[in-house]
């Protein structure tokens, strides 16, 4: 499941924020395309959504209780071992400036800023790894 998500994420990143014309012309599933204006980098590279999903999955598979601090620790670990783009400036700065040994720093730097996005929803697919509903609700 995680592999398929990462492949779809890497394929789809080309079309995020792209013009309708670009999407119509290039979304043919024949291979990865460059983003509009992109020269060579970025083909086949997954985004922040996959990276944070890996952090969620690693926490859930560890068997440790799920807390904000533990999520922050796993998000930081995932980012620090393989930094990549896709994050908002504010979140990327918090990831760069925070130490995984002190995840509370990351939580303090990422308090909600009054805007909504679909980022958190994109990162919840790893919850599908939990086999029973009661455990999902508990976590």
Could you say what each language-model-derived stretch is?
Residues 1-139:
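Structured, active/binding-site neighborhoods that engage oxygen-rich ligands
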């Amino acid at each position: 499941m995680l592999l398929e998500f990462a492949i779809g994420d890497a394929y789809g990143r080309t079309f995020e924020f792209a013009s309708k014309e670009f999407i119509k012309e290039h979304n043919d599933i024949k291979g990865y395309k460059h983003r509009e204006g992109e020269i060579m980098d970025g083909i086949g590279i997954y985004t922040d959504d996959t990276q944070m999903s890996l952090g969620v999955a690693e926490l859930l598979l560890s068997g440790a209780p799920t807390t904000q601090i533990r999520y922050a620790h796993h998000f930081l670990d995932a980012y620090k071992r393989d930094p990549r783009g896709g994050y908002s400036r504010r979140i990327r700065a918090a990831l760069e400036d925070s130490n995984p040994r002190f995840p509370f720093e990351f939580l303090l730097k990422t308090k909600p800023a009054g805007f909504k996005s679909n980022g958190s929803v994109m990162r919840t697919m790893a919850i599908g790894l939990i086999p029973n509903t009661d455990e999902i609700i508990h976590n």
